[in-house]
């Protein structure tokens, strides 16, 4: 089930920088799989997030992009990321189809968990080999085309977005 999509405004002053994919299961059950081959990093303080660098954007080969996968921990921050990617992992090559972890409901605040889902973003490179800030919509691309999700949000503004 697709929840919020790229560029949704679900609270004042905020535009959603990715796609939320809900599974309808409990936290720690639904696998999260790498969509493309690339170089995985998990920062030392990331409990629920990995990012994969794609040296060649599959939709525009002359640029590098980063795919950001998050909410892979329970509401208290206990990670569901695969043990092969411990905190502090940098630039580990992964194939498409690699198990990254499992969907969770971690929000960063144990008193306010989110629903169990995967948030996935496609983030711009800064031109010097570093990822831009994923929280700023202008630093991201609409992820829909990268994952074969031709969502109908802009054509049907009065209905719930669904895949065509």
Give the predicted meaning of each segment.
Residues 1-49, 55-57, 96, 105, ...:
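Surface-exposed, glycine-biased beta-strand/turn segments
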Residues 103-117:
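Active-site loop architecture of trypsin-fold serine endopeptidases
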Residues 75, 106-108, 125-128:
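Short Gly/Pro-enriched loop/turn and capping motifs at secondary-structure junctions
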Residues 63-65, 84-98, 113-164:
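Acidic, glycine-rich catalytic/binding loops that coordinate metals and/or anionic ligands
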Residues 34-88, 113-119:
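Zn2+-dependent peptidoglycan hydrolase active-site motif and core
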Residues 11-25, 56-70, 82-84, 124-134, ...:
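Small beta-barrel nucleic-acid-binding modules, principally OB-folds
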